[in-house]
Amino acid sequence: MVPFLVLAQQCAPTVAPQTMAAIVQVESGFNPYAIGVVGGRLVRQPVSLDEAITTAQSLEAKGWNFSLGIAQVNRYNLPKYGSTYAQAFDPCKNLKMGSKILEDCYRRAIVKMPGQEQGALRAAFSCYYAGNFTGGFKTKPGSPSYVQKVVASADVTTKPIAVVPMIRKTPDAAAAVAAPVKKRQPADRNSVLVDLHPSSQSMPATGAANAPVRLKTEQPATTDAPPGKDNTDGVVVF
């Protein structure tokens, strides 16, 4: 396990670690396998890399638009960064992509708001969420705006992120080598279930941990607009 702020410094060096932490808190709750579906949500989130990849592939095959990973990078942004689904679920690679998107938003915002660092940063949060400098400031009755949620998470207590551990040098005789044990595969790992009437949430919703991940037969909602973030249904996308 690696402290998030350490990981952010290494993988997203162009964004202040606590700023990245606030976005990640709102986007995924520090879940590297999170998937947010536009127009719906998963009944439960994937619990492993294999399940997350399979879920993403199934959603793509059915025509759904979604964001994925710890910083919730939209699927349509992956080709721009040469990323596969497997790489997008890697916390470091996902943070790197997310930070590049936020950095681009901030650079454009500060040009429009010279000398207003914090104002430009908030505009960048809106851009990260909605693809523009205004959508992230919109509120709904009883719910704060996306920008307000991120700002409120500025002092969030970060969670450690699981990574491949550092090797420890030990005498050969003391380093026991065991054959890998074949793990039992998650039930119905080849499909996902999408709830077409999700409740309003600020991050991908999680259901019962033991519920199978399936895909309903209903067709996804279509949109004429370019991919953009919409966090009103527990989905955050670019």
From Swiss-Prot:
Keywords: Virulence. InterPro entries: Lysozyme-like_dom_sf, Transglycosylase_SLT_dom_1. Gene3D superfamilies: 1.10.530.10. Residues 197-238 are annotated as: Disordered. Pfam families: SLT (PF01464). The keyword Transferase does not apply. Induction: Specifically induced within macrophages by phagosome acidification. Induced at 37 degrees Celsius in minimal medium, suggesting that nutritional stress is a regulating signal. Belongs to the virb1 family. Transcription of the operon is maximal in early exponential phase. The VirB system could be required for the establishment of the replication niche in the host. This is Type IV secretion system protein virB1. It comes from Brucella suis biovar 1 (strain 1330). The lineage of its organism: Bacteria, Pseudomonadati, Pseudomonadota, Alphaproteobacteria, Hyphomicrobiales.
